[in-house]
C-alpha cells in the first residue's frame, strides 16, 4: 500500500489592477485561486484581475509556511523578483 501525502502550495499572484504581488499558501491551489478571483479573500478582494505567476509544492505544511514567510520578507521578495524578472517584464511590472 502506498503513502498518501497532502501537498501544500506556496503561490504568487500578480494584480493587473495595482501591479502588486500577493503571496500565500494553501492545500488546494485551484480552489484558492478561484476564491481570490471571485472576491472571497479579504486581502485581495479589491485587487481584481489577479493572475497566478508562480507556485511551489511542499509535502510538509511547516516547510510551506516557512517559505511563504521568507517570500513575504525583504530578501525573499527581492529574490522572487529576480527569479520572475522575465514574467514581470512581460506584464510591464515597473519596480524591478
Regions inferred by a protein language model and the residue ranges of each:
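GIY-YIG nuclease catalytic motif and its immediate N-terminal context
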Residues: 1-41, 48-51, 55-57, 63-72, ...
